[in-house]
Amino acid sequence: MIAVAGPTVRCAEYATYGTHELAVNAAKAMAGRKAVILANHGILAGAKDLLNAFNIIEEVEYCSEIYVKAKSIGDPVLLSEQEMKKMAEKFKSYGQKKSIRRETEEARG
């Protein structure tokens, strides 16, 4: 999820749908993030375009489903903020192939 939606997604405090209070709660919880879960309502995502917003929503929903399933058999291990930062850094080069020369140099130490 970190590569798509960022390291954290907050849940906004509940408020009645269509109210200014709900909008304020959503904005507060979403500050600095790409998505927010609205308690008892659903999810909002912000992105540069609609396709990216849908990708964020799909990723958050998928991770939420995994979390609920994991909770059904015990307490899942949650990653610390430090570990999440480490993962974010690793994702910057995730899937990129190293050159043979670089691999050889790294193997030699």
Regions inferred by a protein language model and the residue ranges of each:
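Glycine-rich flexible loops
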Residues: 1-109
